């Protein structure tokens, strides 16, 4: 089956990218460095050519790993990283001041062992800094050749339009899956209007949209799903009837549930490039092959109906996490 590459700014990439956060944090302890390096190289061997990291992942260790493991293969893939969510003395901080963005970029370039970062995102909105000021710094980095493309993450359509007015935005990254469809409120339309590639993270619903999703009681102590209501009880169990319907469809189609979930994001918009993450070589192969799963319009419509936003139980984020993003919410979420 011939796979059509997808547009990412002036580049074209394989329809499924690789999110690298899992190798250092999010769902458990960091991976063994040698095993993580082997996984990254296997990804490139397989044909992945869009890798996503961030300053905050592993407090810089994720970028360092990629820089070391793929130093001699930089021409084979598009490298994305992120600023604004930073670390200092082992603690997270948010800083989108122009001078902070430029300093963070220099540090990322050093860790990644690169002269230029292909795609550089603002990881979160900073309520203390106008987006126009931050974008001015990002535009400067493009002019200086430090970055090639500018991206935004976890921001709404309003901030996207303001940012794009300062400098073209190549990509918008936000959580998007059958479980979390908030980008459909406004961001996907704004991306389409402005010619911005949409990059869904967690397209497998943080592991829930799988053949055998881990139960909350089995989460590792460091698993961030422990504090996200939708992935804890009672909501984990309450959403199982939706999952079972999708699992039946996947079984009928001869694909895994995770492949169906990724294929759904690909079918929703030709400008979507999902970036599922994994520490497993098997899941790496499965996710890559999801680009070969073709959904008919009626299958997409069926999944849309099963996972209607109002049918999915539990908030995506707790109040603190929700306050850190600028993504739109459905009216029923605001009154819950």
Predicted segments with their positions:
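Short, well-ordered coil/turn segments that N-cap beta-strands
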Residues: 11-16, 47-49, 73-77, 114-118, ...
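Active-site beta-loop-alpha junctions enriched in small/polar residues
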Residues: 21-23, 54-56, 82-86, 122-125, ...
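Glycine/proline-rich, positively charged
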Residues: 88-182, 186, 196-197
């Amino acid at each position: 089956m011939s796979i059509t590459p997808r547009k990412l700014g002036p580049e074209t990439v394989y329809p499924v990218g690789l999110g690298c956060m899992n190798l250092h944090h999010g769902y458990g302890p960091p991976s063994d460095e040698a095993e993580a390096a082997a996984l990254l190289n296997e990804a490139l061997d397989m044909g992945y050519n869009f890798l996503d990291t961030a300053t905050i992942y592993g407090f810089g260790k994720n970028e360092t790993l990629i820089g070391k493991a793929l130093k001699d293969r930089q021409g084979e893939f598009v490298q994305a990283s992120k600023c604004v969510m930073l670390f200092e003395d082992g603690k997270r901080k948010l800083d989108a001041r122009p001078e902070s963005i430029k300093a963070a970029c220099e540090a990322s370039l050093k860790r990644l062992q690169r002269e230029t970062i292909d795609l550089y995102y603002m990881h979160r909105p900073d309520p203390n800094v106008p987006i126009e000021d931050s974008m001015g710094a990002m535009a400067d980095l493009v002019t200086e050749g430090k970055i090639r493309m500018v991206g935004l993450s976890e921001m709404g359509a309003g901030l996207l339009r303001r940012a794009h007015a300062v400098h073209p935005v190549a990509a918008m990254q936000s959580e998007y899956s059958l479980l979390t469809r908030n980008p459909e409120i406004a961001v996907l339309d704004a991306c389409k209007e402005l010619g911005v590639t949409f990059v869904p993270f967690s397209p497998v619903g943080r592991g829930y949209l799988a053949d055998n999703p881990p139960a909350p009681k089995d989460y590792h102590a460091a698993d961030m799903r422990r504090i996200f209501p939708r992935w804890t009880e009672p909501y984990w169990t309450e959403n199982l009837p939706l999952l079972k319907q999708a699992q039946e469809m996947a079984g009928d189609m001869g694909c895994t549930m995770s492949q169906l979930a990724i294929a759904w994001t690909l079918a929703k918009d030709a400008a979507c490039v999902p970036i599922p993450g994994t520490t497993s070589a098997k899941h790496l192969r499965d996710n890559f092959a999801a680009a070969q799963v073709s959904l008919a319009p009626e299958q997409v419509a069926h999944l849309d109906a099963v996972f209607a936003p109002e049918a999915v139980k539990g908030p995506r984020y707790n109040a603190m996490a929700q306050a850190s993003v600028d993504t739109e919410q459905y009216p029923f979420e605001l009154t819950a």
